[in-house]
C-alpha cells in the first residue's frame, strides 16, 4: 500500500529495555520506508505508542496518553495514531473498539509491516497486524538508536517459562534466539559507532540457544566480550534456574563483563514460588546466589519482588523479608500483584489478598529494601570505583553522572572527563540512591 512519502513520526516508548530496543528497530524500518523522525510529538504526522502490558498501571498510562492524543487529533485532522507492542498484542482488535482515536495496531512480531499499515491507515482502514511470527528476530535490521553511551542488543525474544503471573508469553510469543552471527554483526556495528556499553537483552536472556550452531549464552557472552574489549558488557533479564556455573565463570573471567546480575526472585517463599510456576524453590535460588558471590567477589545483585500474590499468607511475606535481609540486594523492583488477563493465575488462582494488605506488605518490602540499599551505598564510601560517564549531572554542568560496573549511580566532578569516558572515582559520600565522588583521572578505554 502506498503512503505519503516524507511524513514524520514520533515514537513514545513505555516500559522495559526491550521496548526501547524495539523502538530503535521501528525507527530503522520507518526511515527505510521513506518516513522521517519528528523533533517532538507535537510536530509529528504520525504518533506511535510502543507499549508495555506487564502491569496494570502501564496500561493506564497508555490510556491517559490516548486521551491526550484524541485532543491533538481534533486540532490536527491528518494526525495518525498507532499503538505497537505488548498492549495491542494482549487486547487484540478490541483496542480499536475501546479507543476510536487509534488508526492502526502492530504487535511485537509485525514491525516490518508498519509502512504498509500506515498506508492503509491513511485510507481509513484501521488495520491491525497482531500475528505471532516465531521466526521473527529482526535480524539484518540496523536499529537507529538515540545518541548515548549505551546500546541495547536483543539476543532473544519471547519466553517459554509461563510463570503464573506473567503476561509476556501471551504478548511476546514463544522464545526464539537471534543467530549467533547476527548478534556478532550487531555488536560490531555498535562498536564502530563508538558506544561504551552493550546490554544484551531478552525476556530470559540466559536461555539463549543459537539456532545455527547451538551455542549457549555463556559462549555468546564470552564472544561479545572478546569482540568489544573497549565496551562494558551487561545482560538482562536472567531467570535463576538458567544461571549455569559456566555462565558465572564467563562473568568472573572477563574483565569487561559487569559484576552485576539482575536475578528476579518474586518471593522468598518456596510455596509461593511453586504457585507462581517459577521452576525452582528458595533453596536452589540461594545456592545460585552463593555461587555468584563465591566466584565473583563484590558482585551486585538486584531483583524483582511481588507482594500479595494469590494465596500469600503472613508467613510467606515474612519469608520474603527474611530473604531480603539474607541476600542484601543492591536494589529491587517492587510491586504488588495485579491479575493480568489470560495468565495462568488469572485463569486458575483466586486473587485472595485484599488490596490494603497487598499495599501494606509492599510498603514493608520497600522500607526494608531502601534501608539495605542505603547501607550498601554507605559501605562504598572511601573506595575507588571505575565509572562509565554517561551524561552531565542534572545539578551542575561541572559534574558528570555515570554508573559503576555494579550498576551504582555516581556523580563526580567533571575534571577533563567527557560522557563516554571511563573514570576512576574516589567515593566521598553516599545518599539514599546515589554515590558522590572525586575524579581521580580518565582510565584507558580497554578493559584488562
Curated annotation (Swiss-Prot):
Keyword ATP-binding part of the UniProt annotation: no
Main location: cytoplasm
Record has rRNA processing as a keyword: no
Transmembrane portions of the chain: none
Cofactor(s) required, per the database record: [4Fe-4S] cluster
An example Gene Ontology CC term for this record: cytosol
Positions contributing to [4Fe-4S] cluster 1 binding: 16, 52, 86
Domain MTTase N-terminal: 7-123
Keyword annotations of the record: 4Fe-4S, Cytoplasm, Iron, Iron-sulfur, Metal-binding, S-adenosyl-L-methionine, Transferase, tRNA processing
Pfam families according to UniProt: Radical_SAM, TRAM, UPF0004
Cofactor: record remark: Binds 2 [4Fe-4S] clusters. One cluster is coordinated with 3 cysteines and an exchangeable S-adenosyl-L-methionine.
GO molecular function: 4 iron, 4 sulfur cluster binding; metal ion binding; N6-isopentenyladenosine methylthiotransferase activity
Stored SUPFAM superfamilies: Radical SAM enzymes
TRAM domain segment(s): 378-441
Positions with a binding annotation for [4Fe-4S] cluster 2: 159, 163, 166
Annotated EC: 2.8.4.3
Location(s) in or outside the cell: Cytoplasm
Catalytic activity: N(6)-dimethylallyladenosine(37) in tRNA + (sulfur carrier)-SH + AH2 + 2 S-adenosyl-L-methionine = 2-methylsulfanyl-N(6)-dimethylallyladenosine(37) in tRNA + (sulfur carrier)-H + 5'-deoxyadenosine + L-methionine + A + S-adenosyl-L-homocysteine + 2 H(+)
Sequence ranges assigned to domain Radical SAM core in this UniProt record: 145-375
Biological role stated in the UniProt entry: Catalyzes the methylthiolation of N6-(dimethylallyl)adenosine (i(6)A), leading to the formation of 2-methylthio-N6-(dimethylallyl)adenosine (ms(2)i(6)A) at position 37 in tRNAs that read codons beginning with uridine.
Membership in a protein family: Belongs to the methylthiotransferase family. MiaB subfamily.
Subunit structure of this chain's protein: Monomer.
The name this protein goes by in its record: tRNA-2-methylthio-N(6)-dimethylallyladenosine synthase
Organism from which the protein derives: Chlorobium phaeovibrioides (strain DSM 265 / 1930)
Gene giving rise to this polypeptide: miaB
